[in-house]
Amino acid sequence: MRAITGSSLRRSALALGAALGLVLVAAFPAAAQTKLKMVLNWKYQGPQGFFFVADDKGYFKAEGIEITIDQGDGSATPIPKVASGAYDIGFGDINALIDFASKRPDEAPIAVYVMFNRPPFTVAVKADSPIKTPKDFEGKTLGGAANDGALKLFPALCKLTKIDCSKVAITNFAPNLREQMLMQGQVDGAFGYVNTIRFSAKLSGIDPDKQMRFINYGDYGMDLYSNAIIVSKKLVKEKPEVVRGFVRALNKAVIDSLKDPKMAVAAVAKREPLINPAVELERFDATLKDEMNHPEIARIGLGNIDDTRLKKAIDILVDASQLPRTPKVEEIFTHEFLPPPADLPKALF
């Protein structure tokens, strides 16, 4: 019989421990990541870098989230896509959400983090166009993508500026034809977001500063919020901590991206190598300045909303679009999932 030594006992103990460890790993696997599907407002561009930074730096993973981020086809479309269950989360126009919630309150998703706090909606016209104010739209032809946020809000602009909408011809075309349709004179004005049009024009060899002008909705009483993180009622009800974790991860990425915009654009380029990094960096900076830099963020922080301001926006849209009911502020946005106020960015530059 072989003598049992101290070293053999130690080896046996280690082997037993390793075996038990394997059993425990099998019995208690690592916590599964929650898989989420997100749809953007548009194609992969500089301003979408926030989301990809959160993914690349592991912020979503640290919150137990495995994210899939798909390109979008208009700022209004994420709302029905999230409402239908096709996606868990969307980056879309909060005004389209107000419209949806007015008509289908039981299905409507809810906003949890507003990123575009200034209205980007515009009608672009040629620099030499006789159109100077919204009233000049009468008798003209305006065009845009069917799901364009500015087009969806045009009835509200008509109401506020006393335009007779019946005197304005509206035509639809694919988003990639917008600048071409305008510059060739096939339409008198094109709906869109200011920076979307500006930078699409630049990529097409058009100088928007010399060849275009913009009739901006915000200059005519439409002090509206715009794109926000929209989540499904199902996700809010069944996995509120996942929603909170998503917002926390995104907020960290926003802070990082504000410090290093080139990193944000590089994260986009990783997914879409054909982008022009220099143009997308310029687009990123312009989006910060024109669409995300409302003075209120110094007080309430980026991501948050002013309830009184949102209530006024809801009233404007309900009245102008003759919606069937007036949603309450808490139906459209919840503060529940925001990080502590001290953690929200108070300045962008």
Residue spans of the language-model regions?
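Bacterial N-terminal signal peptides that target proteins for export
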Residues: 2-17
